[in-house]
Amino acid sequence: MINFRKTLPLLKIINHSFIDLPTPSNISAWWNFGSLLGMCLIIQILTGLFLAMHYTSDTLTAFTSVAHICRDVNYGWLLRNLHANGASMFFMCLFLHIGRGIYYGSYLYKETWNIGVILLLAVMATAFVGYVLPWGQMSFWGATVITNLLSAIPYIGPTLAEWVWGGYAVDKATLTRFFAFHFILPFIVTALAIVHLLFLHETGSNNPSGINPNADKIPFHPYYTIKDALGFMLLLSVLLLLTLFSPDSLGDPDNFSPANPLNTPPHIKPEWYFLFAYAILRSIPNKLGGVLALLASILILLIIPLLHTANQRSMMFRPISQTLFWILTANLITLTWIGGQPVEQPFIIIGQLASMLYFLLILVLMPLAGLLENYMLKPEW
């Protein structure tokens, strides 16, 4: 009998990617987040598609169209809350996925890592333009503050900001184009995710030990399909618990008020997943400096492969690097907390110290720890 799975061109690609794929036998639950991100993306595209059928991207009706979805559309409240909280789950998985990559040295697959950083930027752009669409107070003022940062770019800045706005301020033209961007970007993200997977399958997966796993590999199906299925169920359970019991806990109360350009909210802040970058932006008392620090806080991921000094790939057997990694994690949580606080003491100084420590850890301390651990591995030590 002909095995179509191995002969038909399209099925052959799927077979080599998800069924007969040779996978290291020792990869842990930290390797589940790639598939969980794929599931999050599918959930976001499906719920977003149904929301787009009822949403209107006009300043006069955007807010009421979202209210209409929640009140009058069959299960509209569920679609909207799944979409909003699905974004939070997406970023939670994204941060854990990146953290895993840093801890286990997966960034040494440079092509996969660089595509991943581009993916992160694309997902962040998607989430930002999406947050503007309900046209609540925080949507409007968040869009105003963040797009205004473009005007800090020397010479072309003010023109660039007006070009993005489609006028002299955030208005109808901005909302319409942001809806268009929010519709197209997830499909670009999907294409990038396929390229990400393509580059990963050129080298094969990394594993917790960081050593070459070619001597001990097992087929992806059934071992890791069942493991991924468990991850799917756990993530869906958390998402549904959040959506059904506490759907607004991660949102901002100001977004329940329609956008009003004449009334500025007391504390303008983005969604929780951007707060760490927002804290770094605010910690520098200069507009252009803040924008550069904001960009650097994300783009620093691109140079992490160049800063790898250790002889071992993974941090599994490197206690000093492990300690610094968890300090970095705590530092990012601190930055997230600071980003949600008002601009006053002691939050200003804490934010500035945490921002300095963030760059110091990645650029100086972690590479030095790698060199020290190399020295400690020598027999004379």
Curated annotation (Swiss-Prot):
Q: Does the keyword Transferase apply?
A: no
InterPro entries, per the entry: Cyt_b/b6_C, Cyt_b/b6_C_sf, Cyt_b/b6_N, Cytb/b6-like_sf, Cytochrome_b, Cytochrome_b_C_euk/bac, Cytochrome_b_N_euk/bac, Di-haem_cyt_TM
Asked if Transport is a keyword of the record, the answer is yes
Binding-site residues for a ubiquinone, renumbered to this chain: H201
The UniProt annotation places heme b b566 binding at H97, H196
Keyword entries, A-Z? Electron transport, Heme, Iron, Membrane, Metal-binding, Mitochondrion, Mitochondrion inner membrane, Respiratory chain, Transmembrane, Transmembrane helix, Transport, Ubiquinone
Q: Where are the transmembrane segments?
A: 33-53, 77-98, 113-133, 178-198, 226-246, 288-308, 320-340, 347-367
Where do the coiled-coil regions begin and end?
Answer: none
Which CDD domains does the record associate with it?
Answer: cytochrome_b_C (cd00290), Cytochrome_b_N (cd00284)
Which terms does the UniProt entry file under GO BP? mitochondrial electron transport, ubiquinol to cytochrome c
- Which cofactors, if any, are listed as required? heme b
* Gene3D superfamilies in alphabetical order: Cytochrome Bc1 Complex, Chain C
Give the cofactor note: Binds 2 heme b groups non-covalently.
Reported function: Component of the ubiquinol-cytochrome c reductase complex (complex III or cytochrome b-c1 complex) that is part of the mitochondrial respiratory chain. The b-c1 complex mediates electron transfer from ubiquinol to cytochrome c. Contributes to the generation of a proton gradient across the mitochondrial membrane that is then used for ATP synthesis.
Indicate the family of this protein: Belongs to the cytochrome b family.
Q: In its UniProt entry, what is this protein called?
A: Cytochrome b
Organism per entry: Phascolosorex dorsalis (Narrow-striped dasyure)
Q: Organism classification, top ranks? A: Eukaryota, Metazoa, Chordata, Craniata, Vertebrata
